[in-house]
């Protein structure tokens, strides 16, 4: 008697397990279907609809990491840097939260790490009250990108852009205080009333600007035709020249900066010509 009851109980357990497995399988199929629908909406720029579909995919299968990554990306696409609205802040924060959730399960996810770096950079570059803090976070996360992908030229490029952004406003303010126009081709002048102004700026910004130059060089070592890095070589060297001690040093640095401008222009023209030639030859153009 007990044997029959035991067999019946086992049969019930097996049946319940089968139902659970079928249900899990159905949920995964639902999740996949919502993912595809979300991808289609995303490709046509319907980011809000895409986010809805990705949310449904996660609801059907909470372990679906790809859907969560796509959801975060859909929210990030709806964020507009510099727009100070509650909705825009929500897009930024939701994207950030979802990318962070992705990293809890997959700490070395490159796309999530790059996206967090980008979110911090964009909000920092918007010049809000927390700009300096967010740019520092952007630097931290771009270094994490390099830790995952040492050949990531965009991360090195951004590490070069950040110190220039941080120096831009103080440099302009210093020129104004020293009665120098932005176009005046001289390093910052000593001033009896503001005797420590230049020294203070040099102590704070010289090394970060120099590090920025080195990071752009690393980006160019990865891609010698990276014209964006060339453009920031120009800006970093040109602005750092304001901290030079002599007119001779300044002139030499400005010449080097101008050389980078020319190289960037030549590279851009060469790429455009190569692309046009490829199209004319019937080939698929590449970047």
Predicted segment positions?
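Bacterial signal peptide processing site
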Residues: 27-29
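Alpha-helical segment of the N-proximal tetratricopeptide repeat
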Residues: 32-56, 60, 81, 198
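Short coil/linker segments at helix-helix boundaries
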Residues: 31, 46-48, 76-101, 119-141, ...
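Canonical positions in the second alpha-helix
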Residues: 56-57, 101-102, 144-145, 219, ...
